[in-house]
């Protein structure tokens, strides 16, 4: 069973032969290698590229350990280029090679090679794309399966697929398992023995217990504004552990560098500026988040919000958390300042959308809560409320678009309604 990753294949096709290093980044086990070595390679072969002109190197395999030496690897690539024809280099997990940017820069100076690399750590990739390749690095971010991709190969109906996706996430391997036990064991094992171990070893972390607990704290607080100071207080009061703000901040950065979590900044909509140190943190894959918590804390509201956030990133949007300041009267009739939250401020080019995510909108109180933030935004960009279920999109009397989660997830252009 093959999962089509057409969105990413199209991005590779559009960048083919553009004279830049194509750097495919994303969390480990999200399908980067399959995209490159199977899907994209097949595209090259089907479009007339000779197999001898495709050079494949997987640096995470023990069989290629010697190629982690940059000089040995460069010589291997040069020796594989037997003529002046165009060659395509597919280089997997490039962060295993020290000074890899020197090898790639040398390849950039050769006119007859088109280079594609993958990597699983942004610290060694995203910053280097800018600084080392001098504008000739082109990053393509890959994510775990979107719900639409997951559903396309799921053996069951929408409701069952949605329940499974909320619990076990979208790592491609998950769809091959039949039992819940297999899925749970797989996620727990790779979180401890792949993801967390990678972070600890790569960053030479001594405080192993602390970063493990930090992951638990972040997993318990998806979609909740927080900062290192608040987390340090949690460690002190609930765990009787000393964990400095700076160390917490560094460890959060390490988790983000490994693509395990994403940070959403808070944006003052009226003031048009970013504010404060509080961030919201979301997990790149909810199955990993849930496995870390031993599949407890299944809060559908925050899980749904996390899924919407990830889907927006997959579609190429920039996503922030919105804040709207208003003045209101308290119980004593005094005029007080209040801060209302908009779940997501979504930007792409000159397009902007304001999005609220609501698991349940049946009560009048909940409707007021979700709509009030949108009512106080002083511009005419589209305002959307995504609710749980299969509701088709419609506009209410105030012009807000209300749509069900199913419509949002299964229609790539759903925000254009």
Give each language-model segment a name.
Residues 2, 148-325, 337:
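Interdomain hinge/linker elements that couple catalytic modules in large macromolecular machines
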Residues 2, 25, 34, 45, ...:
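A cross-kingdom feature that marks ATP-driven nucleic-acid transaction machinery
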Residues 2-19:
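Pre-Walker A adenine-sensing motif
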Residues 19-37:
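Walker A/P-loop nucleotide-binding motif
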Residues 55-85:
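Short glycine-rich substrate-engagement loop in P-loop NTPases that contacts/grips substrate
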Residues 82-100:
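Conserved P-loop NTPase "ATPase switch" module shared by AAA+ and STAND
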Residues 114-120, 141:
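Structural recognition of the conserved hydrophobic beta-strand(s) that form the central parallel beta-sheet
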Residues 123-138, 153-155:
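Short regulatory helix/loop adjacent to the ATP-binding pocket of P-loop NTPases
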């Amino acid at each position: 069973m093959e999962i089509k990753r057409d969105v990413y294949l199209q991005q590779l096709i559009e960048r083919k032969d553009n004279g830049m290093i194509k750097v495919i980044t994303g969390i480990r086990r999200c399908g980067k290698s399959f995209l490159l070595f199977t899907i994209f390679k097949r595209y090259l072969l089907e479009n007339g590229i000779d197999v001898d002109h495709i050079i494949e190197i997987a640096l995470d395999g023990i069989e290629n350990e010697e190629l982690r030496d940059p000089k040995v690897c460069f010589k291997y690539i040069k020796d594989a280029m037997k003529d002046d024809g165009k060659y395509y280099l597919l280089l997997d997990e490039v962060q295993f090679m020290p000074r890899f940017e020197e090898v790639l820069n040398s390849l950039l100076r050769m006119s007859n090679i088109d280079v594609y690399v993958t990597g699983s750590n942004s610290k060694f990739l995203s910053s280097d794309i800018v600084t080392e390749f001098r504008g000739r690095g082109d990053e393509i971010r890959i994510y775990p399966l979107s719900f639409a991709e997951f559903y396309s190969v799921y053996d069951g109906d929408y409701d069952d697929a949605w329940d499974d996706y909320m619990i076990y996430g979208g790592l491609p391997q998950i769809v091959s398992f039949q039992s819940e036990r297999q899925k749970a064991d797989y996620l727990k094992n790779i979180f401890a023995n792949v993801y967390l171990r990678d972070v600890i070893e790569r960053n030479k972390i001594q405080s192993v217990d602390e970063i493990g607990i930090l992951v638990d704290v972040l997993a318990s607080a998806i979609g909740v504004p927080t900062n290192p100071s608040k987390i340090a207080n949690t460690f002190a009061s609930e765990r009787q552990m000393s964990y400095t703000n700076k160390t917490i901040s560094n460890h959060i950065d390490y988790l983000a560098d490994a693509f395990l979590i994403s940070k959403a900044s808070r944006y003052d909509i009226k003031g048009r500026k970013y504010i404060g140190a509080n961030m919201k943190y979301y997990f790149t894959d909810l199955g990993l988040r849930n496995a870390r918590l031993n599949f407890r804390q299944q809060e559908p509201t925050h899980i749904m919000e996390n899924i919407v956030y990830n889907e927006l990133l997959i579609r190429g949007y920039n996503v922030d958390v919105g804040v709207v300041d208003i003045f209101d009267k308290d119980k004593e009739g005094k005029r007080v300042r209040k801060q209302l939250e908009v779940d997501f401020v979504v930007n792409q080019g000159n397009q902007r959308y304001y999005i609220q995510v609501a698991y349940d909108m049946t009560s009048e109180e909940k409707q007021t809560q979700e709509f009030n933030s949108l009512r106080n935004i002083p511009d005419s960009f589209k305002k959307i409320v995504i609710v749980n279920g299969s509701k088709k999109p419609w506009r209410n009397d105030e012009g807000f678009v209300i749509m069900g989660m199913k419509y949002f997830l299964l229609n790539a252009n759903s925000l254009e309604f």
